[in-house]
Amino acid sequence: MDLFSPAKLNLFLKLHGKTSHGFHEMTTLYQVIDFGDRLSLESSSEDSLICNLPELNTPQNLIWKSIQVFRDYTQIYSPVAWRLYKCIPIGSGIGGGSSNAATALYALNQHFQTQLSNDVLQELGKKIGMDVPLFFSLGSALGIGCGEEILSYDNDHRDERYVLYFSDQPVLTKDAFSYVRPEDFSKREECLSLYARNNDLEQSVFRFRKDLEEKKHMLKRIWSPFNAHVRMSGAGATLFVSYSREIETDPSTAKALHATIHNSQGLLVNSLRKYNGWFEHGDNLLATTRQ
């Protein structure tokens, strides 16, 4: 079994404060995209994981946590062999580890024909990581609480396209949240349309990653002719540009836009929706995770 393990973007992320347990409460709009990794699974005489990035061949890989959570729930202990081809950069804020964990849960459910419902898989995903439940949505979802409570959302931004800009240096999630200050918090809104399309974590990340702040200013300059919006995804370090597909209907504008993407070394991606059980896409893969 070979599956696509897609990345995600946070189209906005608003922080509202801290819980009594010290976690940050938030509201975020997730969008799965057609860029990601590939994960394969087969029966084996012993558990194994082979990845094209040796640093991910460790017990800390979230795929192992998915296996443990699945086994605890189903009491199925048959060994399996995994092959993971990573394209999503480590520490990039676009959900690589979480996606791999969710894809592994789905693969195990299919492989062993355990027929666990989507709701059960989503609950199991919460035990693994904050973003994991997202991947059991159709692709667009609202995250509340600490981001792990997922509500289906009919994304009215499906006419948007996105251009990704990776960083050579990852951002650790714990570092991003450790720099958050009370003045970074946003008030809760009753209507999603009242939330500005930005990421409150940018303020904390830019306190220790001035290079990303400068990069955002640079991207805003070069994308200014296209009425595009630049922001950070998750805890970083990926910055992305969003723009309306409508502007590509003009040939001269489309030509200038795609020249900008090429010259700025961006990666053009689209939103992705789930059909027939899981996300399917195989074209938008990179040969390397380091841009």
UniProtKB/Swiss-Prot annotation:
Tell me which Gene Ontology terms the entry assigns under biological process.
isopentenyl diphosphate biosynthetic process, methylerythritol 4-phosphate pathway; terpenoid biosynthetic process
Q: What is its EC number?
A: 2.7.1.148
The answer, when asked if Magnesium is one of the entry's keywords, is: no
Alphabetically list the UniProt keywords.
ATP-binding, Isoprene biosynthesis, Kinase, Nucleotide-binding, Transferase
Sorted alphabetically, which InterPro entries does this protein's record hold?
A: GHMP_kinase_C_sf, GHMP_kinase_N_dom, IspE, Ribosomal_Su5_D2-typ_SF, Ribsml_uS5_D2-typ_fold_subgr
Q: Write out the catalytic residues in the record.
A: K8, D131
Q: Which GO terms describe its molecular function?
A: 4-(cytidine 5'-diphospho)-2-C-methyl-D-erythritol kinase activity; ATP binding
Reactions accelerated catalytically: 4-CDP-2-C-methyl-D-erythritol + ATP = 4-CDP-2-C-methyl-D-erythritol 2-phosphate + ADP + H(+)
One short Pfam name that applies is GHMP_kinases_N
Q: What is known about what this protein does?
A: Catalyzes the phosphorylation of the position 2 hydroxy group of 4-diphosphocytidyl-2C-methyl-D-erythritol.
Name of the protein described by the UniProt record: 4-diphosphocytidyl-2-C-methyl-D-erythritol kinase
User: Which species does this protein come from?
Assistant: Chlamydia abortus (strain DSM 27085 / S26/3)
